[in-house]
Amino acid sequence: IKVMKTLVIHPQDKSTDFLIPVYMNLGGFPDFEKPTIIRGGVSRDLIRELIKQHDRVIMLGHGSPSGLFSVGQFGQSGMIIDASMVEALSNKPNNIYIWCNADKFMEQHPTLQGFYSGMFISEVGEAAMYNIKASQEVINESNNLFANVVGNYIDLDQ
């Protein structure tokens, strides 16, 4: 039996901590080991090597169509996941991409597979940019529900 190895890349940022339930209960199944969780403090080269060593990569945080922002947690680069990581991420059908406009990143890189988000509203200012009237309380409730549902069903048989 092959054990699935999961890498989680979630740059340390209080405004995206609501996503922690997506991965906090991973592992413990006979066919899954506890994930490797990276929140910052490592080089892009090490991230690339870790991606290659794992069967599935879960990437979460702030981002754009160009990739996942490093939010100052991974040295000088503004991105931790971008086009330079696509080759390492390819051929991993169970990857998860959760950041604003991850769908646009996926469209630009057709070799990538997995579950991904579109625009993700995490604060009132983002909602206002899209003419959505919502309180921070409603946004938090929606985001917490999303993270808990994904976390509860992430390892179910496909």
Residue ranges and their predicted role:
Residues 39-44, 76-85, 158:
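General structural signal for secondary-structure boundaries
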Residues 95-158:
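Active-site-proximal C-terminal subdomain of hydrolase catalytic domains
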Residues 53-54, 92-93, 111:
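Short, well-ordered alpha-helix to beta-strand connector turns
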Residues 64-91:
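A short, glycine/acidic-enriched catalytic loop
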Residues 1-58, 96-98:
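A domain-level signal for caspase-like cysteine endopeptidase catalytic cores
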Residues 22-23, 71-74, 110-112:
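Short, glycine/charged-enriched secondary-structure capping and boundary segments
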Residues 12-18, 42-44, 62-71, 101-105, ...:
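Short acidic, S/G/P-rich loop/turn micro-motifs used as interaction or catalytic elements
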Residues 45-50, 68-69, 84-87, 107-108:
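Short, T/G/N/S-enriched strand-turn elements that build extracellular solenoid repeat scaffolds
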